[in-house]
């Protein structure tokens, strides 16, 4: 966000959201403008609410897919509507997809960047969630689409990168193995797998509490 925002610039952020996104926008001098993710509509983004909150100061839109904290997985149709809005208003798209490999019940995860080759998208992921090794603080961002639209942003990223003297070399050393080796995460998200069974247990336990419903 520091590479993108000037004081007073606005970024559309989902509500509810992973709070680090709101914090990042604020610390960079921007204003986080929250758009509704509606519980009554499977926690999907309210497209009309997004449209209403765009101003001449809006620089980008953040999506979290799969969403933290709601757990919603956005279908292709919803993502396409977001792309259409971003295209109309020339917005950058920041897509937090760190849970993209932890999708269960045969649902499909669609990366929004695949629907927006003409826009400038920044997609985020990392080993802590995708490979369930949270102790290794290593992640990445993928810049895709029309790089000309993100020229100033890319220059800002390069400047900020040059200010960092030390990377997490021990963690970086395992990236190749994690991405190219045996993908054990698939065993965790099917019936009998630890993540799947934990989800089932928590879902039942929450719904057994009077006045509480989990979806």
For every predicted segment, state its role:
Residues 193-196, 211-215:
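Conserved PLP-binding catalytic core of the aspartate aminotransferase-like
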Residues 1-10:
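Phosphate-binding glycine-rich loop
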Residues 28, 88-89, 119:
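Helix C-cap/helix->beta junction micro-motif
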Residues 3, 23-25, 85:
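Hydrophobic/aromatic ligand-binding patch that stacks against planar heteroaromatic rings
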Residues 26-33:
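A short helix-loop-beta submotif of the ANL/AMP-binding
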Residues 33, 38-105:
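Active-site phosphate-binding strand-loop segment of PLP-dependent enzymes
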Residues 114-193, 203-205:
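Conserved core segment of the aminotransferase class I/II
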């Amino acid at each position: 966000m520091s590479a993108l925002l000037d004081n007073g610039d606005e970024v559309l952020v989902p509500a509810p959201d992973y709070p680090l996104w709101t914090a990042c926008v604020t610390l960079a001098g921007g204003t986080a403008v929250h758009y509704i993710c509606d519980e009554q509509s499977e926690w999907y983004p309210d497209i009309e609410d997004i449209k209403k909150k765009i101003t001449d100061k809006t620089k980008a839109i953040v999506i979290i897919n799969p969403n933290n904290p709601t757990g919603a997985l956005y279908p292709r149709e919803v993502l396409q509507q977001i792309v259409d809005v971003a295209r109309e208003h020339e917005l950058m798209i920041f897509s937090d997809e760190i849970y993209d490999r932890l999708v269960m019940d045969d649902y499909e995860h669609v990366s929004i960047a695949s629907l927006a080759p003409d826009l400038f998208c920044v997609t985020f992921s990392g080993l802590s969630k995708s490979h369930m090794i949270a102790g290794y603080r290593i992640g990445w961002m993928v810049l895709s689409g029309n790089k000309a639209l993100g020229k100033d942003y890319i220059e800002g990223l390069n400047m900020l990168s040059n200010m960092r003297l030390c990377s997490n070399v021990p963690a970086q050393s395992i990236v190749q193995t994690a991405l190219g080796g045996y993908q054990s995460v698939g065993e965790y998200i099917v019936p009998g797998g630890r993540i799947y069974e934990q989800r089932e247990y928590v879902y039942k336990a929450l719904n057994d509490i009077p006045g509480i419903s989990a979806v």
